[in-house]
Amino acid sequence: MPYVTEWDEAKKVPDEIFKEMGERGYLAGMLGINFPTQYTDRRVKSVPPEKWDHFHEMIITDEISRTGSGGLVWGLIGGYGIGGPPLFKFGKKELVQRIGPDLLNGNKRICLAITEPGKLPFFTKSRQVIALTFNRCRK
């Protein structure tokens, strides 16, 4: 990729690149779940959705990583890969229907943010509370 160095220095991957990932169906395949055909009509041309699996996700990640830019990898699939799965697995149906298509098509971005007011032990002590919250959301 000829512009990776400039993108790294700017600390931003152009929105058009992320959009292209969505148009090619790559974003829909990077969630660690079955290919969500109900939220997008975009498909990876070489693999039908019903045959898509984690191996294919690994191939995409490996190919993006060949650029040698951690900034590009994290800019394209880092936050998306961390923030997208909880939405699609645990999010309320109305929320997924409203946000999901734009995420999968590359029109919007997502990330998972965890704040730590003090230090790391605060978060590790909070895991039970977080698990309880997720369980309540699923019921």
What does each model-found stretch correspond to?
Residues 1-77, 94-98, 102-105:
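Amphipathic, small/basic residue-rich leader segments at the start of a protein or domain
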Residues 38-40, 82, 120-121:
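Short secondary-structure boundary/hinge segments and terminal tails
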Residues 90-139:
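Glycine-rich, Trp-frequent "lid" loop and neighboring beta-strands that shape
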Residues 71-81, 107-116:
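Core alpha/beta catalytic barrel or barrel-like domain that forms the active/cofactor pocket
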Residues 72-94, 123:
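N-terminal glycine-rich flavin-associated loop
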Residues 60, 83-87, 113:
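Adenylate-forming
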